Amino acid sequence: MLAPSASISRMQREVRNGHRGAAILLTGLPAAGKSTLAQALHATLFGCGWQTVVLDGDSLRIGLSRDLGFSDADRQENIRRASELAALLVENGQIVILAMIAPLAELREVFAQRLGEDYREVWCSASLAVCEQRDPKGHYARARRGELAGFTGVSAPYEPPLQASLVLDTGTQTVEACLDRLVTWLGECSVLHKT
């Protein structure tokens, strides 16, 4: 099956938006600060007139992927769906901010393969101890009690990215400091380049 051709090209959309489309994956342990940083980046870019959208892993899990669990196959399918949605949005000139654990290198590679040169990977690096201390949803505590099987960081692995485009120390740096570094870096790597 072939996708229909668009009557308005990506280049036309990007000219109208004043910037190119791109996808930025914020990956890290649960409670590493991905969603907080994604929302801060979204607000900053929106305030500057950029067309942005946040795809948060938790939101996708209660909507688009509500039929999926946490088996290896379900995690793979969740990432596939998110990468396809991100690709559609990027093609329409959006800057897509993905806040997802994406715990394994092979899962992050799905994004890299699907999104190609439009993809940037940012590791929100925070120690397991810091993430467990934060535990805003009580998931770490539940996982430690054996109530959550396959919870990343406790009973399922998180593979730190070896090829992340940017590493942010979200465990010790403030949200503001991480946001400032992220915005500066996005400018340096031409994601925030006016067309």
Annotate each language-model stretch with its function:
Residues 26:
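Hydrophobic anchor at the beta1->P-loop junction of P-loop NTPases
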Residues 30:
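The conserved Walker
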Residues 125-128, 133-181, 188-194:
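Small-molecule kinase domains that catalyze NTP-dependent phosphoryl transfer to phosphate-bearing small molecules
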Residues 21-23, 51, 95-97:
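Residue-level preference for the first positions of well-ordered beta-strands
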Residues 39-87, 91:
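Conserved substrate/cofactor phosphate-moiety recognition/catalytic segment
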Residues 1-23:
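Extreme N-terminal, non-catalytic leader segments
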Residues 34:
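Conserved lysine of the Walker
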Residues 63-70, 74, 86-144, 150:
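ATP-dependent NMP and nucleoside kinases share a basic, alpha-helical "lid"
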